[in-house]
A protein has these predicted regions:
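N-terminally biased helix-coil "hinge/interface" segments that flank
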Residues: 1-174
Length: 174
């Protein structure tokens, strides 16, 4: 409010008059952008379907300079040692192929706790059709890591396209 009071004084009015005549106040910062660029956000772990932990590095398989084999790779938002696969699998139509194994989630959480994670992103294959495994995982995380931020891809970006879901969920978890 101090900033608005200074603004009102600068334009020769009172704060009450300024607010009365104002229909919208918009405030923008670069805090979120800086957290991503500087890698200074939360310590995030990623749980994903077993065998798919490298999707952040694989991206969509495309490179800006596709034939340049020496092109430097960008570091993924979440390092590989904090990206863990768990036993579960949904089919593309949303039916369960492999039931969620709570013991595998528990073991993965032990690893993330040991690595100091205070935020956990969860992105399972085909969870946009049926988020049950992600929701069950969230309950397990909250029981074991009650102070951790939990971010589910089925909440953030429930769409087809695995890389987009994983990367959006990872950014949100930062």
């Amino acid at each position: 409010m101090a900033g608005l009071e200074r603004l009102a004084a600068a334009v020769g009015t009172t704060l009450a008059e300024l607010l009365r005549d104002t229909t919208r106040i918009v405030h923008g910062t670069t805090v979120a952008t800086n957290a991503i660029l500087e890698r200074k956000g939360a310590t995030v772990g990623l749980l994903t379907t077993e065998g798919h932990r490298d999707i952040l590095e694989m991206r969509e398989g495309l490179k800006p300079d596709r034939y340049n084999m020496r092109m430097p790779r960008k570091e993924p938002l979440i390092p590989r040692d904090r990206r863990l696969g768990v036993t579960e699998r949904m089919r593309p139509d949303g039916r369960t192929e492999i039931a969620l194994a709570p013991a595998s989630v528990d073991a993965a959480l032990d690893t993330l706790i040991a690595k100091g994670c205070n935020s956990v992103a969860v992105c399972y294959l085909h969870s946009y059709h049926d988020p049950a495994h992600e929701r069950d995982t969230a309950e397990l995380i909250r029981a074991k890591m009650p102070d951790a931020y939990v971010c589910l891809s089925s909440d953030v970006f429930p769409q087809l396209k695995e890389y987009e879901r994983v990367s959006t969920t990872a950014v949100n978890a930062l």
